[in-house]
Amino acid sequence: MKIFVPATSANMGPGFDCLGTAVSMFLELDVLETSDKWFVEHDMSGISHDESNLIVKTALELAPKLTPHRLSVKSQIPLSRGLGSSSTAIVAGIELANQLANLNLSQQDKCKIAAKIEGHPDNVMPAILGGMVVASKIEDQYYFQELPLIPFDFLAYIPNYELDTKASRNALPEKLPFKNATHASSILGTLTASLALQDYGTAKRLIEADEFHEPYRQKLVPELVKIRKIAHQHEAFATYLSGAGSTVMTTIEHSRTEEFIASLRKAGLDDRIEQLKASSQGVFIEK
């Protein structure tokens, strides 16, 4: 059995901790033979191979008596780059327990469990449901709506340095003035409605008008301002900081992507670039 989980791009502009989309880059978990103890094969530096691995740890939270297996993980998703690497591991662990322990979890169950473990829903829900999702939590209940896929390329510029989520969060202010918070919320509300109506002309301006996190984090990711400037020259839809960074995501019409990449390289932006699409496919199984 193989479990596939898509990467996610969250915190889309003003959609801080609530708006994210699945993209066409995957973690693949191959469930192999039973064993005396859990062992996770992978080639990722700094990630454990035993039952403390986040995938296994998550599965055991749901089903403590699971029979140990040998697992093999292959992932296209770079670690600590704002593309949901920890969320994909959590979702893979939930699905592993769901399949091996026959838990028969609903999508709502999976979303609630994953968001509780991760701490916020904007990465895990698109990884489970696929597509673009906006979500919030009231008391102990999560509410979400699925939005139409953005029909452009997602061009991920992935700097050659990690940006720890905790460090990125520490760059944020503890409080926002009431006036600032209401203005930032109005931008998010209008953006969400524009995306739902596929009014990309309006959404284009709003997604780059974040006041929640990008103004405070852009000093940690200097590439954001540089790439956004070049993207404007190529009439891209929008450029934003993906997740907590360090990936900078640009959504752009496919016909403009090649020239945009060439301009990035010409400007000396030489790190990894991935040309992706929004993915309608959430976590899925091959047996």
Curated annotation (Swiss-Prot):
Enzyme class, UniProt record, top EC level: transferase
Any GO molecular function: homoserine kinase activity
InterPro entries, per database record: GHMP_kinase_C_dom, GHMP_kinase_C_sf, GHMP_kinase_N_dom, GHMP_knse_ATP-bd_CS, Homoserine_kinase, Ribosomal_Su5_D2-typ_SF, Ribsml_uS5_D2-typ_fold_subgr
Pfam families, per database record: GHMP_kinases_C, GHMP_kinases_N
The keyword Transferase is annotated on this UniProt entry: yes
Enzyme Commission number, as recorded: 2.7.1.39
Pathway(s) per entry: Amino-acid biosynthesis; L-threonine biosynthesis; L-threonine from L-aspartate: step 4/5
One cellular component term from this protein's GO annotations in UniProt: cytoplasm
Subcellular location: Cytoplasm
Catalytic activity, as annotated: L-homoserine + ATP = O-phospho-L-homoserine + ADP + H(+)
Binding annotation for ATP: 78-88
PANTHER family assigned: HOMOSERINE KINASE (PTHR20861:SF1), HOMOSERINE/4-DIPHOSPHOCYTIDYL-2-C-METHYL-D-ERYTHRITOL KINASE (PTHR20861)
Function: Catalyzes the ATP-dependent phosphorylation of L-homoserine to L-homoserine phosphate.
Protein name, entry field: Homoserine kinase
Primary gene name: thrB
